[in-house]
Design a protein with these regions (language model features):
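Ligand-binding beta-strand-loop-alpha-helix segment within the catalytic cores
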Residues: 72-134
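N-terminal glycine-/serine-/threonine-rich phosphate-binding loop
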Residues: 1-59, 65-72, 85
Length: 134
């Protein structure tokens, strides 16, 4: 028997870090909330399908700006390690997207909920890329 529904049970949407934090913004909360809301509205039709929607996101520009802030403030506060910076910005991006999706779902009368999951990064300290950072 063939599956009558050609849409897979799980849909994965990957949102790049530059999509959530483009270069043309200063990074205010309002700007980031607006981008998250637009993203949620664009993806909302996928939540009406009979599937599991999984959204992943990058955070490259955000973590870069966090590190810049730390460099500028290093004489007043102790800088965080890279893994903590990544977790910090990953959490902020996830929070903004979850909040935007919850609002979009509620406004559409959709009973689904957004759930966030922070992942861990493993870095090899002997990676030769550390000799020539970009």
């Amino acid at each position: 028997m063939t599956n009558a529904n050609p849409i897979p049970k799980r849909l994965l949407v990957a949102i790049g870090g530059n999509a959530t934090h483009p270069e043309n913004i200063t990074g205010t909360s309002k700007e980031q909330e607006s981008i998250a809301a637009a993203t949620a509205r664009a993806l909302l039709p996928l939540t009406q399908l009979e599937n599991q929607l999984i959204i992943t996101h990058g955070n490259g520009p955000g973590v870069g700006k966090t590190i810049m802030r730390q460099v500028l403030a290093r004489h007043r506060v102790t800088p965080m390690s890279l893994d903590i910076c990544v977790a910090n910005t990953q959490g902020v991006t996830a929070y903004l997207l979850m909040q935007a999706f919850e609002n979009a779902l509620r406004n559409a009368g959709n009973p689904r909920h957004a759930i966030g999951l922070v992942t861990q990064v493993e870095v090899d300290p002997s990676d030769p890329a550390f000799a020539r950072p970009t």
